[in-house]
Amino acid sequence: MELARSGANVAGVVTFHGGLGTSMPAQPGVVKAPLLILNGADDKNTAPDIAGFEKEMNDAGADWQFVNFSGAVHCFALETANSPPGCVYNKRAAKRANRMMGDFFEEIFGD
């Protein structure tokens, strides 16, 4: 997210269960790349920052999409994650998130 917040010239940014908070919020017009945020709905690490992140991106005029996966916590896309309750692999959420990332890249890069 910090790369996107910096205004870097990249085609798009995807994050799986990434941190959303920052000490340097994006300024209006700075975020150039579309964003796809894939998050576990039960992720206690990101939950406190979601509303602030959404407001920040709206205020910045960013093109963003935030997806919460039910029943998923932090680390949901890492097959080796097995540290309940906060970091656990979720096969269904991981498959859906990877499919969404593929669609996002298809939109950006084409065939």
Where are the model-predicted features located?
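Primarily recognizes the serine-hydrolase "nucleophile elbow" in alpha/beta-hydrolase
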Residues: M1-K32
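Short, well-ordered secondary-structure micro-motifs
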Residues: E2, P25-A26, P48, L78-T80
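N-terminal Rossmann-fold cofactor-binding loop
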Residues: H17, G40-A41
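Short, hinge-like loop/turn segments at secondary-structure boundaries
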Residues: V30-P34, S83-G86
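Short beta-strand/loop motif that positions the catalytic acidic residue
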Residues: V31, L36-N39, F69
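Acidic beta-to-alpha connecting loop that harbors the catalytic carboxylate
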Residues: A41-K44, A72-V73
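Conserved alpha/beta-hydrolase "acid-adjacent" motif
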Residues: K44-G52
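C-terminal catalytic histidine-bearing segment of alpha/beta-hydrolase fold enzymes
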Residues: N58-D111
